[in-house]
Amino acid sequence: GDSHMQSGYFPGTARSSLQKYFGNAGRGLVFPLRTAGTNQPDDYRISSSGGLSRNNSARGICGYALNTNSSPTLEITTNNFFNTDNSFNKISVISSKPGLSASVKQSPSSTIDLYWRDYRSCSVTWDKPLTNVNLSLSGEPSTLYGLMLERTQPGLLYHSAGINGAGFYTLLDSPHLFDQIGILNPDLIIISLGTNDAQGRYRNDQFSSNLNKFMQLLRKGNPDTPVLFTLPPDSNKQGKHNSDLGKLEKTLVDYAKNNNCAWWTLSEVMGGKGSVGKWRTEQMASKDLLHYTPKGYMLQGYLFYQAIIKSYKKYSENNDPKD
């Protein structure tokens, strides 16, 4: 997703709500975003001893990348900002080959390496879930693409990654991002883009072309994974309602219908055209009438959770649970 997702309030609320229903298998993807010079969700903190620098030419599964110049130690701390247990007893480190080895002081612990195309995923597991761990990285200079925090118990993993300013068009030159999705082995891919595509000078034919190129890159490594589009929230452009959002929504829905994808029309759930103004009145939208406040994003995340559960229950009532 874009900045609506990077702030963490929408996906954090959806994640915690879904995990209360399906079980908690962990926080999922995290990244030292502040070390990369950008904002980070509130439910975790990662600090570094040094030896990391931003890689501006690569964009991995978390939307950003860091070069390792020595053997850094990361202090990873999680909290219950979204009223969910974010303790973990497994960390996976996703990096470029030859890759990074990972170790923690917890004992006993075990390490497993997975090699996927041009990447290495090194996982460390220990017994008791914790909320604070010092992770030591070693190996030849590599690119760090992501970290994954898990609990070794049944439940749901809801990974999220947002990139400020991202649109379908900005990610077409990000092969690492698309390649690394396979490491997660997802059961569902949720795409939350479109706001930035509809800003500036919008051309529907160009957007349609970018959308198709984006999906070709995604489908190359994930040909059969179900895809769900969350359509952009209502917003303004140049001081008035962004009328291009309707054109973009139609193009996305037409694509979804023709390619067996699902979609969720957030702007409709919010109240339709011009609803961003009403959300601003309730202190749920920012002054720019483009972004939303934490309160607004958290409500959107909860509405998304409700839509997922409603569809899940409807499906379960009409199908054999074994299917």
Ranges and model annotations:
Residues 17-22, 193, 215-225, 259-260, ...:
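Sec/Tat-exported extracytoplasmic proteins
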Residues 6-107, 113-209, 244, 291:
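Conserved SGNH/GDSL esterase-like catalytic core that processes O-acyl groups on lipids
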